[in-house]
Structure formats: C-alpha cells, structure tokens
Amino acid sequence: MKLDAKSTIEAGKAILGIELGSTRIKAVLIDQENKPIVQGSHTWENQLVDGLWTYSVEAVWYGLQDCYADLRTNVKSLYDTEIETLAAIGVSAMMHGYMAFNEKEEILVPFRTWRNTNTSQAAAALSELFVSNIPLRWSISHLYQAILDNEEHVPSINYLTTLAGFVHWQITGQKVLGIGDASGMLPIDPITKNYSSEMVDKFDKLIAPKGYDWKLRDILPKVLSAGENAGFLTPEGASRLDVSGHLKAGIPVCPPEGDAGTGMVATNAVKQRTGNVSAGTSSFSMIVLEKELSKPYEMIDMVTTPDGSLVAMVHCNNCTSDLNAWINIFKEYQELMGIPVDMDEIYGKLYNHALTGNADCGGLISYNYISGEPITGLAAGRPLFVRSANDKFNLANFMRTHLYASVGVLKIGNDILFNEEKIRVDRITGHGGLFKTKGVGQRILAAAINSPISVMETAGEGGAWGIALLASYLANNGNDQSLADFLDKHVFTGNAGIEISPTAEDVSGFNTYIESYKAGLPIEEAAVRFKN
C-alpha cells in the first residue's frame, strides 16, 4: 500500500540522504517510491588556513546539525510531524583530500580538501611508481606529500579517511568506505573490488626506510560495495545529527560515498556503456567502462561506480563562468538601453541564436580559462577571445564559440577515450547549469563528444538524492538485483529523459574548431605570462 508523505515519515519508512558539497550541505528525505518529499540545507565555505584549503571539524558538525534541523523544520511545516526513525540513512561528500587521525580519534592536522595542489611532487612520484595516473587531489598523494615534507604528525597516523568516511565513522563506529569514494583515495583493483594490493605493497616498500609503526592497509577504511552492510546509527551518532533528541538509534546506514558516485546514481549512469556529464562552474565526464584502458593517461582519472565498475573521469576546472560573464555584459547593455532585464530570456535568446551560427564558429576562438587547466597544460588562466580580421565575426558565432569553449577541454579529454581507446557508449546524461536553456547545451555537448545526450528533470536533485537512493538500495533490495537493475526498475522506470543526437555538420564543425583551439593554445600561454 502506498503511503502519503506524512504517513511514510511517521511509519519510519522514509530514507535520508545527506551530501556535504563544497558550498552546501544538503539533506533529502525520499519516500517508498524513491521520490524526494522534503529537503534541508546549510551553506558553508572552505577556509584558507596556512596556505591550505580546509573546513574545520567543528564546521562539519555544526553544518550537519543545522542542515538536519532545517530538514526537521520543513517536515514540521509541510507535514506537521516529527522524524523519529528512518528505513535507512546515507552520507556522501566531496571526494579525495586528507583526514588523518591518531589512536585517540583526534584529527592530526586540519582536513585538507581536494582543492589543494601542494601535492605535485608526491603525485608525480606515485604515478611513476604505480604506472597509473595519480591525481594531485587523491588521498594517497596527500599522504605521501606529508611524508616527503617530514610532517611531524605522520608517525602518529592510526586512521586515514575522506570526509564522507569520517562522518560515517562518527555516527556508526564503522571504519568503512564505499568503493567509489575509496577509488579516490587509492586505485582499486576491479577484480577484487579492493585497493590494488600491488600498489599498497609498492607504497609500503617505498616508505619502509621511514620506520613508521603503521602499514598502509592498517590505516585505510575497509572497502564496501553498494548494498553491503555498513553499520547502524549509534545513540551518539543520532544525537550528533539531531540535537533535538527525536531521532532514534539502530537505523541501517549504507556505505558512505563520494560526490562522483552519487552523481552517477542520480543520473542513472552506473551501468557499463553509460556515462554522465556535469557542466556548471567546472565540468567533468564519467564514462563507465567495459574493460580497463590500454594504458594510463595523465588527463583521465580512473575511479569506480558505487558497485565497483571502472569509470574513466575527465575533470575540467572551467566551464560556464566565462560564458556567464559575457551574458552579464549583454545584461548591462539592456539596462543601459532602459530595456527590462529577464535573465532567463537573455540566456534563451543568446543560446538559441548561437545555433544559427557557423558549425565551426566562423573561425572565432574562445579560451574560458578563469583558472588553470591541467588537461591543456596551463597552471593559470586568462579568459581570452581571439579572432582574425577575416573571420566571420557576428553575434551567433560569438555566442557559439563561448558555448564550444565551455566544453572544449572536456572534448580533448574524451577524444582520447572515443578515438584512441575506441570506447563505446549507449547513453550519456547531462546535468548542471549549461543545460538549463532547453536543447542548446545538449546539442553543443552532443557535437563535442559525438554522442547522443539525454537530460532528465530529476538530474537537478543531485548528490543528496543519489546517496538516498543508495540507502534505499540497502534497505529495499530484497531480491538481490544489481544496482543498475534496481535503479532502472524502482527509480527511473523507463525515464531516459529527453535525448538529442549530434548532427554530422555540428560534429565536423566542432572538430575543425578544436584543431584551431589546440593550435592557438600558445596565445593563451602568452596571455598568462604577460597579463597580470
């Protein structure tokens, strides 16, 4: 029998997902049909302390408590009831970074987030040692950099985890981590669905001369796949989340996951030959692979889905920020002319007008580098618009080049997967700000990666919904379905979203554009060198 939202909450059948993102902590309650029924949130910011980006442990708990309190308030105002118990809980957070604890469970140095780039020496050395691409932001890079820097705390490490792993440990007592989040600490062996034992052994041998009391295996969280038992909410955990004291202990908690994994779940992209692209301030693509790549590539990170399939991730620092800055110039023009401003209309008109331009943007090129872009080898960036005197300079081409630029670096990374590795995909789902204007961002991305792109209404629900779905998979998967089948049958039920396929003309035009773009990169390098 289907219960209404109020009865679902009162019967303890609702499921809670909480995600700690870089600017917001979001909580969502879902019903027995896996649909969101109420949300809560808390806004927070990272701090730069001693040259490193961090959030304090106090800020983590204050943020979680405030987010949960906001959820409680919304439950009260919408349904006039109280959350006493739940069918399951899931916690997810931004991946990677460094949270190291001693045996008294005290944090040894402030949490170092994924944003820190002080690990280049360690990442380069480990990439060579492991014969695998080890990004700067991965936990193992942070650990080895601390060792290289002879940091005092290293001998005292008893446990090393991610933000999601930390919160889960504190509310359940379990030192575990979902496989997707674990794959951002250290590479995963797709066969054993555990940390690569070869790499763990190599690391221990590398640091053996230091004589630490610990081995790498001893300090890492146990790896779990989606649906596995990851512990229960303890009385201390319940009071840490809900300071009002209403929430009861004993609720099952699913394996904690990273934001990449919850994004895959929220877009129904955990099956092999599917993928998703997140395109907002920054962008990334995640393609679920059928087999390992033939060799490591510096611009492709290897992670996994929450159930352990290999994923090739291309991450770009820049996406829509420069595009938005140009849109604001047109907004200023309208205000100057005394024309009423409707931002949705400005975006809609300019984006759609871009589609009337030349497929190769008439020769115009844009570099949208607000910050550096590792894939194209730039440590810093300067937004740059470049044209020759005889290019076709008009508004449609001007807007089109800025739309192309928003996914240009993403194309360069994905061209390796599709052209060199011959990866095949059946469906890619897009989500994020670039797709807000119907059909335009989709068509541009379809041309960039020569693949049909779907957009779903629910994609905007994001990671908190994704981790709630993983908690639902733990609680409601009575007949042992795979995660992909569970999502297909019980969540998305045939909703593949609205799909746009690339046209031959757009694909050919984008390919011409990207060759000019790559040839012109020294212009961007010069801008970085000479423009303060």
Annotate each language-model stretch with its function.
Residues 178-181, 213-225:
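Conserved alpha/beta enzyme-core scaffolds, especially Rossmann-like or related mixed alpha/beta domains
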Residues 113:
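Conserved phosphate-binding/catalytic loop of the ribokinase/pfkB sugar-kinase fold
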Residues 2-10, 16-17, 83, 121-177, ...:
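Active-site core segments that coordinate phosphate-bearing ligands/cofactors
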Residues 116:
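Carbohydrate-associated surface elements
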Residues 1-110, 124-125, 156, 217, ...:
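N-terminal glycine/serine-rich phosphate-binding loop of ATP-dependent small-molecule kinases
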Residues 109, 181-188:
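Glycine-rich phosphate-binding loop of ATP-grasp-fold ATP-dependent ligases
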